[in-house]
Amino acid sequence: MRGTTSNGAAPSGTGVAVVIAVKRLADAKTRLAPIFAPHDRETVVLAMLVDTVAAAAAVASVTVVTPDPAAAEAARALGAQVLDDPTPAGHPDPLNNALRAAEAAVRATVPNVVALQGDLPALQAQELSEAIAAARTRPRSFVGDRHGTGTSALFAFGVPLDPRFGPDSAERHRRSGAVELTGSWPGLRYDIDTPDDLLAARRLGVGTQTARAVGAER
């Protein structure tokens, strides 16, 4: 998915694969249920994924691991690779298992991996590029979310990703040895779980698909 910079230099995403795990849309973002009917919520979740993948287009590859046909179709339409989520029903750690599967799929061709949340509708391509450049200075690092408790992106350069997403993932990644990156990348930190998160991201400025989906459903 990569290109070149305006001066002809290789972009910071060269040699980097982004992996994004997406659960079934019907099961995603249930904390948005107070403001969206089920079908509308799925539409918004899919729009956020599309805006996130579009913002990551400058990296060497983007792989979306998902069991959801609509998410897979949308990712392919943007030029992303799609991996059918191999995680069995009832797995105790489905998100991290899906990310490890995606990591294994891309490691043969790309040495460096970024696990990115798929709900970053305010993400700007330049923010991700700057974060990747900062991450290159250490083997493993992460960007925390705006609340300081979650993780928006986990970077692994030449080492295993070792994802530990879930409750208090920022602390879990920190304890596992990942270095926290402190750059000013607001769009990279605004992942969406609650109505307040979505409102904050809209104030910051969301991508076209999310803006259209949210506007249509309000």
UniProtKB/Swiss-Prot annotation:
Keywords in alphabetical order: GTP-binding, Nucleotide-binding, Nucleotidyltransferase, Transferase
Protein name: Phosphoenolpyruvate guanylyltransferase
Reaction catalysed by this enzyme: phosphoenolpyruvate + GTP + H(+) = enolpyruvoyl-2-diphospho-5'-guanosine + diphosphate
Role description: Guanylyltransferase that catalyzes the activation of phosphoenolpyruvate (PEP) as enolpyruvoyl-2-diphospho-5'-guanosine, via the condensation of PEP with GTP. It is involved in the biosynthesis of coenzyme F420, a hydride carrier cofactor.
Organism per entry: Mycobacterium sp. (strain JLS)
GO molecular function per UniProt: GTP binding; phospholactate guanylyltransferase activity
Family the entry assigns: Belongs to the CofC family.
TM spans (from-to): none
Pathway participation: Cofactor biosynthesis; coenzyme F420 biosynthesis
GO BP, sorted A to Z: F420-0 metabolic process
Residues involved in phosphoenolpyruvate binding: 151, 166, 169
UniProt EC number: 2.7.7.105
Pfam families attached to this UniProt entry: CofC (PF01983)
HAMAP family registered for this protein in UniProt: CofC (MF_02114)
